[in-house]
Structures are given as structure tokens and as C-alpha cells.
Amino acid sequence: MARYFRRRKFCRFTAEGVVEIDYKDIATLKNYITESGKIVPSRITGTRAKYQRQLARCIKRARYLSLLPYTDRHQ
């Protein structure tokens, strides 16, 4: 039986020494939402709880200000 390699999860924000996540940094926020627009849970991304809360708040702010879409484009 083949065993697959599971990559170790780590918090990117802790590794980079980020103090506060910025809601205007769309490139970073897009990495943490799915194609359908949902926020990816920390058990998948490996983000620490402190940064996951900040991330959720920033994504919601960016959505409210129309920087990020609430959902994908339905066609």
C-alpha cells in the first residue's frame, strides 16, 4: 500500500513575523478563500487561532468594501 506524504502545516504569519493582517492586502487574502468564496478553516491552512480571527475579520471587511467578492461569478 502506498502512503502519501503529508506536508507539515505551519502558520505563514508567524513565520514572517506579521503583527497585524491588512484588509487591503488582497493578494494574501485570496489565498485563504475558496473558489466559491468561503473562508478556508485553520485546520486546512495551519494558521494559528489569533491570525485566523484577524484573517476572518479582514476578509469580511474587504468583502464589505467590495475589494473581494462574496461568491464566485456564477455563469
UniProtKB/Swiss-Prot annotation:
Gene Ontology cellular component annotations, sorted alphabetically: cytosolic small ribosomal subunit
InterPro entries recorded: Ribosomal_bS18, Ribosomal_bS18_CS, Ribosomal_bS18_sf
Cysteines joined through disulfide linkages: none
One Gene Ontology term from the biological process aspect of the record: translation
Family matches, as Pfam families: Ribosomal_S18
Superkingdom of the source species: Bacteria
GO molecular function term, any single one: structural constituent of ribosome
Coiled coil regions in record: none
Similarity field: Belongs to the bacterial ribosomal protein bS18 family.
Protein name: Small ribosomal subunit protein bS18
Organism: Yersinia pestis
Native organism taxonomy: Bacteria, Pseudomonadati, Pseudomonadota, Gammaproteobacteria, Enterobacterales
